[in-house]
Amino acid sequence: GKFTNREISETFHRWNQGELKSFLIGIAADIFAEEDDLADGDIIDKIVDAAGQKGTGRWTSLEALKLGVNISMITAACNTRVSSNDTGRKAAQEVIAAPSVAAVDKEKFAEDLRTALYTAKIMAYAQVFSLYRKASEEYGWDLNYGAIASIFRAGCIIQAVFLNKITEAYEKNPSMKNLVFDEFFLSRVNSGLGSLRKIISLAVLSGIPVPAFVNGLEYIDLLRSPSVGANLIQGLRDYFGAHTFKRIDKEGSFHHDWKQHY
C-alpha cells in the first residue's frame, strides 16, 4: 500500500480543494510533484532528511512553559526537527529492529488520514489560542482572538480557510475558554477522533513516528478525562517535599504525615 510521490502529491492536491485548503497543503502538493533538475528522479528524494528552524517554535514553547499552558503539539514539532538532526540516527537504524509496515487500503487510509489531520489541526489551534488567552490575561493585552485569526488568513504561511471558522467562533463567544468548546469544532473533534486514533494506532504498530498527532490526541484525552493521575503526583510531592495538596472535600492546603508501609 505504499504511496508514490505522485500519489502523495495528488492526495495533497485533493485535500487542498476542501476544508484543508491552505498555503502549506498547496505547496506540499507541488513539492511531491517536482522533478529534480540536477539528476534523475524527484527532488524530494534528494533533499537531506534533516530540518532547520529559525527559533519561533522554540520561543513559543518556552513562553508556554513559562505561562503554564500545554502546547505539546508545537513542542513536538520542534523536537521532531531537533531529532531529525541527531547524528545517532544512522547507527540506530542499523541496530534497532523495525516492525513491518501494515498493508492498507489506500483510499480508506487517505480519507482517515485527512480526517485525522483536520482533527489534530483543531487541537493545535486550540493549544495556541489557549496560549494567547493566558498571555492576554497575564500581560493585560486584551487580545481580540477573532481578529488574530483573520490576520493570519493572508500574507502568512499558515493562511488557510480553516481560520475563517476560528474567527466565527470567537465572534460568537469572545470569552470562550478553549476553541474545542465551539459548537462547530466540538462536532468535528467528536466525529474525527476515531480516525485520529486509527491513524496513530497504525503508525505506532508500523514504527512510524507521528509525534504531533500523538500529542494532539493526548491533549484532548487529558482535557476530557475525569482523572489524570495528578492526585498521585501531589501525594508524591507532599511525601518527599512537603509541598502540600488540596482536598476534594475541604478548603485550603494540607500536608499529611506520611507513613512508610513497606
Where do the model's predicted regions map?
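NAD(P)-dependent dehydrogenase/reductase Rossmann-like domain
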Residues: 1-262
